[in-house]
């Protein structure tokens, strides 16, 4: 009995040590995930197991072999210290997540604090179990294509909708395995409990169906959502897409380049709107060329997997193809809002990949990118309902909720005021304000976008001032020359709004920028005068 307790205690100690400091090369990296994951997410359970082992040994009788009992006690103490540290780190994730959202460079989000936010639901933490929301309905195995794996499930509460927001979740599994019933459960349960409709598709897998089959199916599933989700209470205009690992890669690529003809599936025409409001990427593979500047020794293994099983083409000679399927290379100004969640101890996807993606996104896109970097956290941490999973789920729900609130077409009650604006528009040039048409001489044709009063809801002056500071910093990071503007209503029916004049910005980019800041419309100033354009389509109002 003593030797059994010794062996199990040694394994628990090794597992916890691997969770705290995993190997990152070769076989050590491969073993670090299955060995270290258990301790990282089940630290409380490991403490209970160790206590039971010591109790059993005490009941059975302490070993008579000299020094063996002392070794067992020393190992038990080590297991206790390691797992208490891991448990503290897991609960600390709540603070890490909150600070990540509140400290975002622009459009910061506040997470509400509560007793549950600090401690979690104790029985969920103990059991690592996320139950279905009460009354949840699951419509299983609905066909979205012809292949046997083109099946999806729809989760909803009976009273969801009409017009409920939708989350499309793509499972992971290295593009070669996985199932819609296996992953993302704690997050999806929380979304459904808050009135969302969740859609979980299967998709074709390599090596039987190599790239672009997985991506074609992901796009086909999104097209099904756009066409059919209204019959399940969802709003096709308020869709976010999420996924973990390979699913995070597919979700990111759907959000950034879902309309690319290279993977547009049969039967999905140009008339289908394939845009999404946000992407929630959990430990996603956001770089597909294996660049070791980001992968820190793991890139060779990625490229080997892609060459042999997924893409089934050598990287050499097909570099453009590999770059085209890399989300990091597809970031445009009109990219949707992103949440990037990544653990620093992930031995399958290095955390530097997420850092590089976020840096490039913030220098390229108008929408916000929220980056949650979790210390001492492995791949696939969100399989169980741990305190860490609870914290990141709250972040995902907050980001998704903000994204689906983004302004759409101009509401009818505002259209009349936009068509005949009584606004005096001024632009700041060389320290003085000049009229909108006078500024044409210096700037040429330009657009004016404001961050004030998002969704045309009057906002406190201090909040508008903060958003202007954030927008100025964001535009500077994008390398855009922005001049301050002021639009005032002589009748006094609407408060004055400040914003930025941008010369050389296309109408499409102006619309994307306006949407990213929650605006229904923007000004366009040309030699023909000042007009107001709809941010949803860029059409003149």
Listing of model-derived features with the role each one plays in the protein:
Residues 35-55, 64, 110-162:
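N-terminal cap/lid segment of alpha/beta-hydrolase-fold proteins
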Residues 163-174:
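Short beta-strand element of the alpha/beta-hydrolase
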Residues 334, 340-342, 346:
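Short beta-strand/loop motif that positions the catalytic acidic residue
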Residues 347-356:
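Conserved alpha/beta-hydrolase "acid-adjacent" motif
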């Amino acid at each position: 009995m003593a030797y059994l307790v010794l062996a199990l205690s040694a394994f628990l100690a090794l597992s916890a040590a691997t969770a705290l400091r995993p190997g990152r090369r070769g076989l050590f990296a491969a073993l670090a995930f299955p060995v270290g994951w258990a301790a990282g997410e089940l630290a409380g359970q490991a403490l209970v197991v160790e206590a039971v082992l010591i109790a059993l040994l005490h009941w059975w009788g302490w070993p008579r072999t000299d020094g063996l009992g002392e070794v067992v006690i020393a190992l038990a103490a080590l297991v206790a210290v390691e797992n208490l540290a891991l448990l503290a780190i897991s609960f600390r994730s709540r603070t890490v997540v909150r600070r990540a959202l509140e400290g975002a460079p622009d459009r910061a989000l506040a997470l509400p604090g509560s007793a549950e936010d600090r401690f979690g639901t104790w029985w969920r933490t103990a059991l690592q179990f996320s139950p279905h929301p009460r009354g949840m309905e699951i419509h299983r195995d609905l066909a979205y294509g012809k292949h046997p794996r083109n099946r999806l499930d729809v989760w909803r509460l009976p009273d969801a909708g009409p017009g409920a927001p939708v989350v499309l979740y793509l499972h992971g599994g290295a593009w070669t395995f996985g199932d819609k019933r296996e992953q993302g459960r704690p997050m999806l349960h929380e979304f459904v409990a808050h009135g969302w409709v969740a859609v979980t598709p299967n998709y074709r897998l390599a090596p039987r169906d190599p790239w672009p089959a997985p991506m074609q199916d992901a796009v086909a599933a999104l097209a099904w959502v756009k066409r059919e989700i209204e019959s399940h209470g969802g709003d096709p205009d308020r869709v976010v897409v999420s996924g973990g690992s390979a699913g995070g890669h597919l979700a990111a690529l759907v959000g950034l380049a879902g309309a690319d003809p290279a993977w547009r599936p049969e039967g999905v025409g140009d008339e289908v709107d394939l845009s999404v409001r946000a992407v929630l990427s959990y430990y996603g593979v956001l770089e597909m060329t294996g660049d070791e500047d980001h992968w820190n020794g793991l890139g060779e293994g990625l490229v080997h997997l892609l060459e042999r099983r997924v893409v089934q083409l050598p990287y050499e000679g097909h570099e453009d193809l590999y770059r085209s399927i890399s989300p990091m290379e597809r970031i445009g100004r009109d990219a949707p809002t992103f949440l990037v969640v990544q653990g620093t101890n992930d031995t399958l996807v290095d955390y530097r990949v997420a850092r590089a993606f976020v840096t490039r996104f913030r220098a390229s896109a108008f929408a916000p990118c929220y980056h949650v970097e979790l210390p001492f956290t492995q791949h696939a941490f969100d399989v169980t309902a741990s305190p860490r999973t609870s914290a990141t789920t709250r972040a995902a729900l907050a980001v998704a909720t903000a994204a689906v609130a983004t302004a759409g077409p101009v509401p009818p009650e505002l259209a009349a005021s936009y068509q005949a604006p009584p606004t005096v528009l001024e632009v700041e040039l060389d320290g003085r304000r000049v009229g909108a048409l006078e500024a044409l001489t210096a700037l040429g044709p330009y657009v004016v976008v404001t961050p004030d009063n998002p969704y045309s809801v009057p906002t406190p002056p201090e909040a508008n001032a903060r958003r202007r500071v954030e927008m100025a910093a964001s535009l500077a990071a994008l390398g855009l020359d922005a001049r301050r503007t002021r639009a005032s209503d002589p009748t006094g029916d609407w408060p004055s709004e400040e914003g930025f004049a941008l010369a050389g910005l296309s109408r499409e980019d102006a619309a994307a920028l306006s949407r990213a800041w929650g605006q229904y419309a923007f000004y366009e100033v040309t030699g023909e005068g000042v007009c107001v354009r709809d941010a949803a389509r860029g059409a003149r109002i």
